[in-house]
């Protein structure tokens, strides 16, 4: 497997000195690089040794294993929370010291503020001692400010690192578990859920560690502040504290509500992403069936449910933020109202000491403490989900490969097993056989007989309920549905083994890959995409076989690898690979190609999980056993087979084989892009994920807001925000004005003037109450409105993006891996739903507060404006300088995240293969390497933001110093109330200013998600689904197809895959399309369905296909695809997504394809929910469902795209027979590799390198010994060629000379005039 990245730069933090660590100077070189050019992956610093994924994962895994053991001994349920606490409590507890010092400094600050204001209240210009003392107080105040600036960021840096470590360790454990899941456990989870654990649930750990310490710091600080307030204003402080205490349960109640909404939302999100995954996976089929609208409705409904929950949780969040915004105002209001009503007199120093003390405790108690509760409750939900996953059954290590101790063999004795413990009928029953080195055991049987299950039993994937399986020797396994992972072709074959040129060349040759590698530009160093997009199914199958052969194992389990390739290659693989290279090995081959049975040492015939017959080929012939009847399903009527056949399924999904039958679900981020293109020589290059550079454009903001509401709403929103902020400042100003009036009065009174004036309490209190109520109301209104608009915007953009994806051409899906598209729908939409509205509102609130603070300071001491200018310039430069680097870091973090998910989903698809090859450890290492790469980016993301924040707080500290010392210098001109207002505001600026700027950068970073979504709302579109010009409803009633000089390519400027094709297909004609892999057979279908726009003209019943809408065209043709695709949902939805048919019609269609009984046995019959991708049906059964769809559509044109490759001959025969019966009056095009499928066609179309080489009746073509078709038939061997020629001849005479009686349907073996048994079961091939 590929190394993920080269050795990176050593981390400068390791050698940094104390000063450098405190001020993050060690990051300066990185910022310089970021300023000069765009940052790339190799600019990132390597992960610190203690942060490596493997180290962290194994450490936590150790504690979890101990916890599981402890729980088993005490007969309890193990607790993941306990394991986490045991692992991390020491290192995390130390960080509490930071919190303690920081929160103490916040409490000390107001005391010294009070002393400074006191100096102003008792101002005496002659008292120099008082002035010096005041300067001393100002110095202590600034010292506290600086300590806060430094400590705060060190604390945050360390707790965020702790969160990262916990997340990385947890991901390591989840992946490790995924590799060990038993098949029963696989039924209880889905790929979507596991990806969700990895993308959403573990992110809660990053957040919970930040706030956790405030669970004890909050209450402690509240007690200290109460004590200080009591000394300052006496009993009135209890009124304020009471309000604070009332707010807390309110907030925790919000928290609980929020967490329950969160888990409900998560269920809907899971369902939406799972369905999205299926849509992207099966997009080709959805387009060919013209089912986009049905899926659009499905996703829209899921999204509506999700959004309604999101809106409700957003309202809660809005209320929460609003209460935070106005909490301090309400508290101060209640405190001073009580204070005044109790008859006390307010003074400036008391007012502002109280305001500042409340300010300190307010942050902790109303923001950090509830956040801690909310995050802890969210984390608990996530830990529960992860714990449930970690406790799923693991695969038993019982009959994993035993040491070969010299004797190598596979021995199965009286083996019985169930996939589903609840089911009554066993999957396999009473099997016994032994295979020794040098033997080839062929396993045959009808669809669903248990052939793949037998292999899984040998692999140890299917645990016995009775009997035993002993395997001596190393296993190599080739799955029925080929699995490749992202990496080079060579790394896919080597799969961790050392490269030995000679052996490698030999394997490449035996697996018929030599020619393919020559066609690829980079040969075996070509990088295969996420789903093997650059390879055709046939190539993938051969790469899988090559991987197995190169392993040089003792035992080979081959699950029908020959059906994915054409006859010639199939023979090459069988003779050179299976019979030669593997001739000394133990080989078990599941196959439907009965012509190879002669070479088998033993043949095992399975039916309904039981062994019907076992013996050698000659024994079978002697006993006169009719293979044909053995391979029949019981409910088939016995009749002489016509000449059926099996086109092959070249490109299959990556998932485990049809064995997962009767399971409720299984991994399925699969290669749904049925590359119906013959990508053999049309490499589709995977485009690099875009990382747009530089600033997020103004256009993105405009589109984002316009998606949310009308511009009038926006003007209203701006006014509302301004009103809220003005009310906020006025409330404080009024208090300082009142205190000033009171102190002037006191001075007058003390000065011995007339004691006639008394302040009108009602007037001052009335205005004060009015301003407080206004602040609260405006705050709530603005919060709710912002959330409503932004969530609405997210909904609109999601719908636009989804619509755009549905209308995108197939090429888009070939160029973009599933993970990348899904990332837009999961991560980016998650940001738009959840984080962006919150961050945005937070940013607006803090921005307005910062503006308020500066305005007040300038109003009080106008000359402050002078030093503000350079500070402002430094700030603007700093922000620009920081964002240049931080944007790149954030983008790198996004792009290094994708491979983690891709690797997980790819591993889940190839789970059996990985386990068979014992490659779990290698995959785990690769996963850890992907995680480390992501950690490098994440670590920079954390540290760069701290670097910036420390510098911002330095600017604020300067501002506080200027205000404090400036007011002392100008003491003559100022009164106490003004100084109190300016200084208390300046102190709040400390944390708030850097938070505001960071939130502005955060908003900009999150706008990247908006950009990414908007980018997908404007994709290149296919032609419209419907035009004004609609074809007549009965069109096409004839089914005549004319190709007139058709050229076809998959991408503009790409190579032509069809060249100057001209052909006429008459009404009701049956046409077989043949050619080597890569000849353009599937491209012909793509051109017909306009999956890409063809050049030239294609007419169907005198209507030009390019002149009508795509849906009008595609709905009128039925296709039975190579790849049987079923979707989650009911069987009814799968057959008839638009509810166009009655129940009777649906049951009849199922009866026709002999699935009626199977469906009737399901608990909900036709309304039973299918598992993810229909995995509770075997591949053969899924193919029959596709046939039922075609029967229901009753179209005049049917296209069969190699549809019966991995079904047994009998099912194949059933499909062929139904096609003959049901579609006798239709035009049928069949792409085939197996020539006997199409030998009885009216015409054969032979394609080669995209050109039409021959087009005539099969018998006519066979008369010409120079024809390509003749050569193809001859390659099958004499007996087969003779049989095919005879069939073609009979069909030819029957069609052209019906008066000559050709009744003899039986092909006779010329040697003895007897019907040949071989021919009987070969006809099915």
Swiss-Prot record:
Q: Kindly provide the PTM information from the record.
A: N-glycosylated; leading to substrate-selective effects on its transport activity.
SUPFAM superfamilies registered for this protein in UniProt: ABC transporter transmembrane region, P-loop containing nucleoside triphosphate hydrolases
Effect the entry attributes to changing residue 746 to Q: Does not affect plasma membrane localization; 1.5 fold increase in PEG2 transport; does not affect estradiol 17-beta-D-glucuronide transport
> Which top-level enzyme class is recorded in the Swiss-Prot or TrEMBL entry?
translocase
Coiled-coil residue windows: none
Residues where ATP 1 binds: 445-452
Q: Where does the motif PDZ-binding lie?
A: 1322-1325
Q: Which UniProt keywords apply?
A: ATP-binding, Cell membrane, Glycoprotein, Lipid transport, Membrane, Nucleotide-binding, Phosphoprotein, Repeat, Translocase, Transmembrane, Transmembrane helix, Transport
Q: Where is the ABC transporter domain?
A: 410-633, 1041-1274
Question: Which segments constitute the ABC transmembrane type-1 domain?
Answer: 92-377, 714-1005
**What's the reported outcome of changing residue 866 to V?**
Transport properties comparable to wild-type
GO molecular function terms noted in the UniProt entry: 15-hydroxyprostaglandin dehydrogenase (NAD+) activity; ABC-type bile acid transporter activity; ABC-type glutathione S-conjugate transporter activity; ABC-type transporter activity; ABC-type xenobiotic transporter activity; ATP binding; ATP hydrolysis activity; ATPase-coupled inorganic anion transmembrane transporter activity
Query: Mutating residue 757 to K: effect?
Result: 10% reduced expression level compared to wild-type; transport properties comparable to wild-type
Indicate how activity is controlled: GSH stimulates the transport of MRP4. Urate inhibits methotrexate transport but stimulates cGMP transport. Nonsteroidal anti-inflammatory drugs (NSAIDs) strongly suppress the transport of MRP4 substrates.
Q: Which residues are glycosylated?
A: 746, 754
As its record notes, the protein acts as a catalyst of:
ATP + H2O + xenobioticSide 1 = ADP + phosphate + xenobioticSide 2; an S-substituted glutathione(in) + ATP + H2O = an S-substituted glutathione(out) + ADP + phosphate + H(+); 17beta-estradiol 17-O-(beta-D-glucuronate)(in) + ATP + H2O = 17beta-estradiol 17-O-(beta-D-glucuronate)(out) + ADP + phosphate + H(+); dehydroepiandrosterone 3-sulfate(in) + ATP + H2O = dehydroepiandrosterone 3-sulfate(out) + ADP + phosphate + H(+)
PANTHER family xrefs: ATP-BINDING CASSETTE SUB-FAMILY C, ATP-BINDING CASSETTE SUB-FAMILY C MEMBER 4
Q: How does it assemble?
A: Interacts (via PDZ-binding motif) with SNX27 (via PDZ domain); this interaction accelerates MRP4 internalization.
The entry's family comment says: Belongs to the ABC transporter superfamily. ABCC family. Conjugate transporter (TC 3.A.1.208) subfamily.
Please report the name of this protein according to its UniProt entry. Answer: ATP-binding cassette sub-family C member 4
